[in-house]
Amino acid sequence: MKIIILGAGQVGGTLAENLVGENNDITVVDTNGERLRSLQDKFDLRVVQGHGSHPRVLREAGADDADMLVAVTSSDETNMVACQVAYSLFNTPNRIARIRSPDYVRDADKLFHSEAVPIDHLIAPEQLVIDNIYRLIEYPGALQVVNFAEGKVSLAVVKAYYGGPLIGNALSTMREHMPHIDTRVAAIFRHDRPIRPQGSTIVEAGDEVFFIAASQHIRAVMSELQRLEKPYKRIMLVGGGNIGAGLARRLEKDYSVKLIERDQQRAAELAEKLQNTIVFFGDASDQELLAEEHIDQVDLFIAVTNDDEANIMSAMLAKRMGAKKVMVLIQRRAYVDLVQGSVIDIAISPQQATISALLSHVRKADIVGVSSLRRGVAEAIEAVAHGDESTSRVVGRVIDEIKLPPGTIIGAVVRGNDVMIANDNLRIEQGDHVIMFLTDKKFITDVERLFQPSPFFL
């Protein structure tokens, strides 16, 4: 596939890195020559320096015969104009744009279609982050929760702790503990190394366990791996930007929410707009303020300012002063590995959420959902099976007959409204949504090929 990526920042660069090794012809456009040179030194791709919305630049990038344009520059307006130019002048078939401003996203249905601004797929990073954090609040103790098949199935990542009945026991004993609940452990990472789970695999404390189950059973399965944490009640947010304000709006109906904002004018605006959130003007690194607001009674402290260092330091202080759990928003990928699992319980990467959303639109075959896991090393995907036994490598076959790439596990199959946790004898049918986990994303091309029906396949 011939893909033009506009923007060589963290998201554009990471997307190029993901796609360049999958037999795609990638061209990256940016105004920053240094960034482009750095990418070209690392990967086999073309670069063009210039403004991504200019027709001359797009023509030089190969827009005349490009299959897809992905606009992820730092400017919403540039991304929108680029999609318009690609549509009007070059008839580019697929156009994807990252749009950050809530003012645009709020009216997305009216703004972004072929008769207005021709964007086929809109990526709204702030909304993705809010959704991600909200899922983690719904499942206290989970490191990551990803929904598939319109929320019917979830993949959860949980650290195994002493106190969970499964610790020190084989995976096969889970069926004895929960005879009426189906789940499949897709992978276990032990000391950062993947283990292919089998019934005889002993779960150890400290294991990072990836499992798939019907969404209503996630909490029950988590209770096998750790003592279930009580649902959160009191939440403190730091940062009143788009993410903080959106999160407060989403949470304030069901939780006791306090929000700290260091800009006085913004704090006053939020105090008027938010219905049940208590808004404070102040600095989250102010010990007196945290003490006055009873930080020791807070169930979850979430720092979502645009300053990584401020988020990390305020969360560390909150934890030291008694907050039960702390979560931080981290822009720099290198910081995520450094902080998560130390004093910081969970680090959220907006870039990773954006990449996952982008990949679901640029994958081949009928891939309707992608989630990048373990800092981009692993992937969970939702693919739709098409064809019949003569044209498909999966339709009409039981799972045991399907030649899956190394490190790939089918976790669940959704057929209509029915969720079926995978077993070797489950037969895949036309239209099934198949949820898979890959411990190594380098095999994603093989998975895509597996789900691409071919008139020549017999």
UniProtKB/Swiss-Prot annotation:
GO biological process, one term: potassium ion transport
Binding site for NAD(+) 1: G7, A8, G9, Q10, V11, D30, T73, S74, R98
Annotated ranges, domain RCK N-terminal: 1-123, 232-348
UniProt keywords, alphabetically: Cell inner membrane, Cell membrane, Ion transport, Membrane, NAD, Potassium, Potassium transport, Repeat, Transport
GO cellular component, one term: plasma membrane
Chain positions recorded as NAD(+) 2 binding sites: 234-262
UniProt GO molecular function: potassium ion transmembrane transporter activity
Function: Part of the constitutive potassium transport systems TrkG and TrkH. May regulate the transport activity of TrkG and TrkH systems. Binds to NAD(+) and NADH. In Salmonella it is required for resistance to antimicrobial peptides.
Matches recorded under NCBIfam families: PRK09496.1-1, PRK09496.1-2, PRK09496.1-4, PRK09496.3-2
Official protein name in the record: Trk system potassium uptake protein TrkA
